[in-house]
């Protein structure tokens, strides 16, 4: 596996660009590694599905922070979801990691952000971590270009019309 961690400037770009280019990259967490296969973009206070749509709160503070940090939150009283902050400090945007094809230590397809976090044991403890500095929790360059499709986001009640879900096919 390539050990080239994606640098901060990878995330300091428009969220839709980052989302598309995260596909095929390697997410590394603890002893797990996997190819990112599906993501969704959430962009700014004008995006009704974005947690930051209602403004700055303790929960969303990381989204207004430095790009390249993790944003982990709890949903439905049972699942955590992993996002990576994008764009510029002060502008709330992130990419939700929805799918992963595990390659280490075993092979498995993890479909859905809650299942992904449960299998990898990603919890609120992993919120607000810098993914550009640690080989334990990061995204590696893969130098693989894959074809993908853009579809409407799923599992949300507002902003469903935006084709901001990116998935390898």
Swiss-Prot record:
Keywords from the named record: DNA damage, DNA repair, Hydrolase
Gene Ontology process terms (BP): base-excision repair
Entry's EC annotation: 3.2.2.-
Listed GO MF terms: alkylbase DNA N-glycosylase activity; DNA binding
SUPFAM superfamilies documented for this protein: FMT C-terminal domain-like
InterPro entries assigned to the protein according to its UniProt record, in alphabetical order: Formyl_transferase-like_C_sf, MPG, MPG_sf
Classification via CDD domains: AAG
Entry superkingdom: Bacteria
Family: Belongs to the DNA glycosylase MPG family.
Name of this chain's protein: Putative 3-methyladenine DNA glycosylase
Organism (species): Wolbachia sp. subsp. Brugia malayi (strain TRS)
């Amino acid at each position: 596996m390539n050990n080239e961690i994606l640098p901060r400037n990878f995330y300091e770009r428009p969220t839709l660009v980052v989302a598309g280019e995260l596909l095929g990259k390697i997410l590394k967490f603890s002893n797990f590694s996997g190819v990112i296969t599906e993501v969704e973009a959430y962009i700014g206070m004008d995006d009704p599905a974005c947690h930051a749509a209602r403004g700055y709160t303790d929960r969303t503070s990381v989204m207004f922070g430095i790009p390249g940090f993790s944003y982990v939150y709890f949903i439905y009283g049972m699942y955590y979801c992993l996002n990576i902050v994008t764009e510029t400090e002060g502008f709330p945007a992130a990419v939700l990691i929805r799918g992963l094809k595990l390659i280490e230590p075993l092979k498995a397809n993890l479909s859905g952000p809650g299942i992904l976090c449960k299998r990898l044991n990603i919890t609120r403890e992993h919120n607000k971590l810098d993914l550009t500095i640690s080989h334990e929790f990061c995204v590696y360059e893969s130098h693989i270009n894959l074809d993908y499709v853009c579809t409407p986001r799923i599992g949300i009640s507002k902003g469903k019309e935006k084709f901001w879900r990116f998935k390898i096919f």
